[in-house]
Amino acid sequence: MINTAHLRKTLTLAMLISSPWSLAQAADYNALVSANATGANAYKTIAEAIASAPADSSPFVIYLKNGVYHERLVITRPNIHLHGESRDGTVITATTAAGMLKPDGSKWGTSGSYTVRINAPDFSARSLTIGNGFDFPANQAKDNDDPTKIKDTQAVALLVDDKGDRVWFHDVSLTGYQDTLYVKGGRSYFSKCRISGTVDFIFGNGTALFDNCDIVTRNRTDVKNQQMGYLTAPSTNIKQKYGLVIINSRVIKEKGVPAKSYGLGRPWHPTTTFDDGRYADPNAIGQTVFLNTSMDDHIYGWYKMSGKDKQGNTSWFHPQDSRFFEYKSSGKGAEKNAQRRQLSDAEAAEYTVNKVLAGWVPTAPKGK
């Protein structure tokens, strides 16, 4: 039970969503976060509000007033829900890159570079921005012999980790450059979201459904007349039916991004330790599927990705050996050719929201 000292407050949060579910027009909240927070259940940091949640799994709803919150958050309690005042006005940000050093001198690595890490089930967030503010363009502009230049530029904004399941994001913006969104856990649902980046900026082995979202490729000034990046890098296990599924969405670009400069995805086979050595996971037969999605002219199709074999040599993994498909793509970036395989109507019928999410129906939470 929640401590009776927690006041019940009610906010009217008008929400519009073009998904099979409608959100409640009002939601109770258990804590308020604001730079000017005063009084019971009001906090100046999101971390403090999360820490105030009781040690159970009851829904705990936190309302975030507009502002920029410079925090790195780890969610380990089930049923935490973050509701922002507005998507572009409520911003959670940090500036950690994989190649930066921890206090002990080791590197953060990709998994450690997150701004927000979800490692518990039944989390949701809506009407806010989660960003990794690592200045990728400024770093890339440095000379290669500059000792301050970071070599490992992966910078995750959101990590849905191993214990993350039934995770829902609505009207959320995820901003970064390389590796913006890492879906490592179970099932995630992104509705009416905006996700931006450059290289492999939606990646991982989890099941993630993107419904009516904007996938935004960013401009780069450090590369000319060559591939700028890739939207996805799935590492879905072959035994897992669904990976990264994008439906009824838009693949768009920032100003200055040239035609045919971005790939829809490439197959990531993570280097993994096995009984007979450490090498690229042969069972990571990644899946990315685009259905009923419009694509601007910067899209050229799929691309290959390298890994290490048992002897430590470079080996290449190709789109045709992965589960990469499209269905009814439209726009200047849409093409039908041997490299861009298409689903039949019958095959596309297997990619309903209910089937991809394995029966989980996202519902709006209420606090107590």
Language-model region placement:
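Bacterial N-terminal signal peptides
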Residues: T10-P20
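Bacterial N-terminal signal peptides that target proteins for export
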Residues: I2-L11
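Sec/Tat signal peptide C-region and signal peptidase I cleavage site
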Residues: W21-A26
